[in-house]
Amino acid sequence: MKIRSQVGMVLNLDKCIGCHTCSITCKNVWTSREGMEYAWFNNVETKPGIGYPKEWENQDKWKGGWVRNADGSINPRIGGKFRVLANIFANPDLPTIDDYYEPFDFDYQNLHTAPISNHQPVARPRSLISGQRMEKIEWGPNWEEILGTEFAKRRKDKNFDKVQADIYGQYENTFMMYLPRLCEHCLNPACAASCPSGAIYKREEDGIVLIDQEKCRGWRMCISGCPYKKIYFNWKSGKSEKCIFCFPRIEAGMPTVCAETCVGRIRYLGVLLYDADRIHEVASTVNEQDLYQKQLEIFLDPFDPQVIEQALNDGVPMSVIEAAQKSPVYKMAVDWKLALPLHPEYRTLPMVWYVPPLSPIQNAAAAGHVSMDGVLPDVDSLRIPLRYLANLLTAGDEEPVKLALRRMLAMRAYKRAEQVDGVQDLEVLKSVGLSVAQVEDMYRYLAIANYEDRYVIPSAHREEAMSDAFAERSGCGFSFGSGCSGASDTNMFGARKANRRDIIKTVQLWED
């Protein structure tokens, strides 16, 4: 057993209001520069819908994730070393700019400089790639906002497998959800296995997956290998880039920018301890629907004395273990089993999990589509949203989704009876296997969601990450693991590096 720590994230979809604040702040901080205009490390999609890029969940088309062989081994779906080498100069599984969208801006200056005329001046769109005038904007990262496109296009959503999409049309006005997406920072990242240059690595201290900008050669196999399509090619620098989980903030014990600015308080950050030796075993599980339960088994109890002892022997600091004991991610994913992984069938073991939304169930109940099971809506009676959520979060297994939804409904019914009627309805808790203490904790974390409860992030121990801190002082900033090799003419932000031989004339501030 080799114990490692991972900073994971949980998003409570039941509270997401679709405001896109997380997307805008992430965009302003990380990708508002030439070459990355089309890239959104964090984006919010409206489901059902085909998403961004188009049909990213259709792995028959994009070949993302892993596939299990007959002998029990797993390989990237895009193929082994020889297939990757054969297609290295012409990747057939690569999304084009039209699958994302052509980024644009508007000629706002024309509103100020237009000559006097009989018509009001207009700010027309202009491409940020070619600089040419765009006659028509045809797609965007949130084009399907609030079910904005016709159902004929949205029915291509891969999560409609084994769902009668035609019948779904009856519930179209009551079944909608927001899905914020970012890099999953997987335990078994397919992007790292797909990279011919070996430029993608996973940090041991916090599990964040990064791309070494010095080693990256722009082959773009990682884009095909990632089933979530959260790696983007910077056409200006010729490098691939992705969400870095705001690791400079994480190292300082601060939440990511998307989590810090979330209006709905839907994001939770915390540490999980896991057994790194079992990653291949879990990812090679025969039945795809068993992957969720198998991934739960890989997480270790941070209160177990044997786990604590082994973690210390494996170099996990005590501060990280203490953070894991207070982790909201562990509570929601392992203890309460409310949070579920996004498409575990990709076998990447994702580490950004989601609490399924109650809104489709409650809205349908209010519209009379759902019968009541005592005081709780009968989740089984609304098969379409349940099957859809199962395809999205548990590889089609409906039982974990049903349990999570029933537990959240039970918490609401219990707290309503307690606060409105002044009684404790213990029967509703017994029906879903929860104690009073667990429900009180769930209410505290889900409803009140204080800052210190949502974000439990230990500060990094940088003194243990390098052998000689004095020699590294003022060295090269964010070097991404390969030191100051200087192999690239651009830095991580796409700008040209300064010539170190330039002589800067000093300014004398005082007289001798």
What positions do the PLM features span?
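Non-ligating segments of multi-cofactor redox enzymes
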Residues: 1-512
